[in-house]
Amino acid sequence: MSVLFISDLHLEAERPDITRAFLSFLDERARRAEALYILGDFFEAWIGDDGMDAFQRSIAQSLRQVADGGTRIYLMHGNRDFLIGKAFCREAGCTLLPDPSVIDLYGEPVLLMHGDSLCTRDEAYMRLRRWLRNPLTLWVLRHLPLATRHKLARKLRKESRAQTRMKAVDIIDVTPEEVPRVMRGHGVRTLIHGHTHRPAEHPLDIDGQPARRIVLGDWDRQGWALEIDANGHRQAPFPL
């Protein structure tokens, strides 16, 4: 059996092509896997478990069916869906995974992250991230009226798109010096993350030892999945 890793699906009712591809992925691949790890930005936006709509509940039910079939499902927050909580995870049959997390993968410790915390050169975003993830801010956000949360989510998404277009490419990518620092701190030689929408495998040298950073692809023009088993790993795109 194998372990699957995906991220940055940005699921929303307005993208039925991505939804169809994801449901097919669940039926054709996830059901046969030992585990499925979703490393953030699973949804385009999430205003709180109490604001789940029919579309989001249908996704939770689809995950639950796969989990009930024996596949372990793990979900990590992204920068778009960091308000996902225990209620959704109970309904979906998945486990909420802290960012970062180290897992044992066929005898090797592997670091999993969404990836946005590695983009330290984007100082404006890092300030916003610290503010949004502050426990007091999270408490306030969860207690705002749903209509206010919807309005705030739309505003943040609009501003994020505009700022991303204006920023230099190297600013919104991971900071090269931050990657080995974080990996060294967790005692790993393999890092898997998403967020940057730049699927690739980057060979590294950490303290004279070979290491690697695997970046997951985003689901927009095509889907992406990383599959790892005892014999190796492969990340490949597939049509939506």
Swiss-Prot record:
Q: Which cofactor does it need?
A: Mn(2+)
Q: Which sites bind Mn(2+) 2? A: 41, 79, 114, 195
Q: Which Pfam families match?
A: Metallophos
Cite a single GO BP annotation: lipid A biosynthetic process
Q: What pathway or pathways are given for this protein in its record?
A: Glycolipid biosynthesis; lipid IV(A) biosynthesis; lipid IV(A) from (3R)-3-hydroxytetradecanoyl-[acyl-carrier-protein] and UDP-N-acetyl-alpha-D-glucosamine: step 4/6
The record's section on SUPFAM superfamilies has:
Metallo-dependent phosphatases (SSF56300)
Subcellular localization(s) per the UniProt record: Cell inner membrane
Q: Where does Mn(2+) 1 bind?
A: 8, 10, 41, 197
Cofactor binding note of this UniProt entry: Binds 2 Mn(2+) ions per subunit in a binuclear metal center.
Q: Which reaction does it catalyse?
A: UDP-2-N,3-O-bis[(3R)-3-hydroxytetradecanoyl]-alpha-D-glucosamine + H2O = 2-N,3-O-bis[(3R)-3-hydroxytetradecanoyl]-alpha-D-glucosaminyl 1-phosphate + UMP + 2 H(+)
Give this protein's Gene Ontology molecular function annotations. glycolipid binding; manganese ion binding; UDP-2,3-diacylglucosamine hydrolase activity
**How the protein sits in the membrane?**
Peripheral membrane protein
Q: What Enzyme Commission number(s) appear in the record?
A: 3.6.1.54
This entry carries the following GO cellular component terms, namely: cytoplasm; extrinsic component of plasma membrane
Give the record's keywords alphabetically. Cell inner membrane, Cell membrane, Hydrolase, Lipid A biosynthesis, Lipid biosynthesis, Lipid metabolism, Manganese, Membrane, Metal-binding
Under InterPro entries, the record lists: Calcineurin-like_PHP_ApaH, LpxH-like, Metallo-depent_PP-like, UDP-diacylglucosamine_Hdrlase
For the ligand (substrate), the binding residues are 79-80, 122, 157-167, 195
Quote the entry's note on domains.
Consists of two domains: a catalytic domain homologous to metallophosphoesterases (MPEs) and a helical insertion domain (HI domain) inserted in the middle of the catalytic domain.
Q: PANTHER family annotated for this entry?
A: UDP-2,3-DIACYLGLUCOSAMINE HYDROLASE, UDP-2,3-DIACYLGLUCOSAMINE HYDROLASE-RELATED
Q: What family does the database annotate?
A: Belongs to the LpxH family.
Function, as annotated, reads: Hydrolyzes the pyrophosphate bond of UDP-2,3-diacylglucosamine to yield 2,3-diacylglucosamine 1-phosphate (lipid X) and UMP by catalyzing the attack of water at the alpha-P atom. Involved in the biosynthesis of lipid A, a phosphorylated glycolipid that anchors the lipopolysaccharide to the outer membrane of the cell. Can functionally complement lpxH deficiency in E.coli.
Protein name listed in UniProt: UDP-2,3-diacylglucosamine hydrolase
